[in-house]
Amino acid sequence: MKDEFDYCIIGGGIVGFSTAYLLSQKFPKSKIILLEKESNICKHQTGRNSGVIHSGIYYKPGSQKALNCRSGKKSLEKFCLDNDINFEICGKVIVATNHQETLRLQALYERGVSNGVECELISKSRLLEIEPHANGVEAIHVKECGIINYTDVCQKFSDLFRQLNGSIYFNFLVKKIKKIKNNKVLVSSDGNHIICNKVINCAGLYSDDIARLSGGKKNFKIIPFKGEYFKLKKTSQHLCKNLIYPTPNPQFPFLGVHFTRGLDGSVECGPNAVLAFGKEAYGKLDFNLAETFSSITFPGFLKMASKHWRMGLEEMYRSYNKKAFVKALKRLVPEISSRDITPFPSGIRAQALDLSGNLIDDFVIDSSDYIVNVYNAPSPAATSCLSIAKTIISKI
């Protein structure tokens, strides 16, 4: 086949489908297609996250993360209300367990205020009123944080996109992107081809690979970090009422293991952050030699490893030692034991790394000629999806 379209979106996660939905609204007469390599939507990052509606408290004021999270959160909540998608604004606590963490907590609170987040510093006694089993000498109560199932949101984007005459091709693994005559672009898979005017790369874990097919930036690499979870057994779900987070380490872009209640009442514990041996290597024994070799031979990888080797070893130890994982959870909820938790499916986060070994701590979206590349869209991309989609469309 060789069908022709105005716009081609690569990637069937929440960023890809929110973009497809808004693009089809803005250009109702245009032919738009979304290509997904899997047989269904949300098989990877969107379908494997903890389902939190983030407030924007963590991000540097004025950054793309801060701006898109704040505006995207409002848009997401309105979209859910308009389309009868279940979500809950339940609030969360970020706890400090010692004096050093209280200093970081104060700085985080001030950042939240700068970003316009509804939050307050609370005492230990107030913390225990909100989360009776939490441990902390002080905490931030983030009232506007919430929970949601992002697969439900993405499915609605997909349904509305189809209703607006959008096309979706599943099982289409993009292997070639080439500019051809008349300023058209040929996008190819095995035996299948489509022609379009513009390409939008929302490929998540594979965004760097798609970018390189079109001659995009080579000064960064998507490094896959696996986040492993446990789940509280039903008899232990009372240990967490809503969301309990640690005070984050500002030197690392991940938030640390935490407790997250789902809409169904279940409670996830995690994730950690360990190097994944492949972009879809979810199991402990999964290993993709080519992808792992590509990661560790990237010039910035060893520089990153030298900066964060101690934390990397700690995370790896927790990955293979349940007692160590439980020890991290006990810092937040001392009553928890290994008997309270059961394994839960892991996820893999796409995190861009630059040549200097820096983990890029902001959204990066760029355009050139015939393609818009979403180079880096880690958390809070799901919360921010509609705002990110507007940014993408503005660059077409």
Predicted feature descriptions by range:
Residues 60-71, 95-105, 140-160, 169, ...:
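Short beta-strand to alpha-helix junction loop
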Residues 18, 177-288:
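Flavin-dependent oxidoreductases
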Residues 24-47:
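Glycine-rich FAD pyrophosphate-binding loop
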Residues 4, 86-96, 108, 121-124, ...:
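Helix-loop-beta segment of a Rossmann-like dinucleotide-binding subdomain
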Residues 51-126, 136, 256-257, 278, ...:
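Dinucleotide-binding Rossmann-like beta1-alpha1 core, especially the glycine-rich loop
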Residues 299, 304-396:
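C-terminal catalytic lobe of FAD-dependent flavoproteins
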Residues 140-198, 202, 206-209, 384-395:
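Helical element adjacent to the flavin cofactor pocket in flavoenzyme catalytic cores
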Residues 2-15, 33:
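Beta1/beta-strand and adjacent pyrophosphate-binding region of the FAD-binding site
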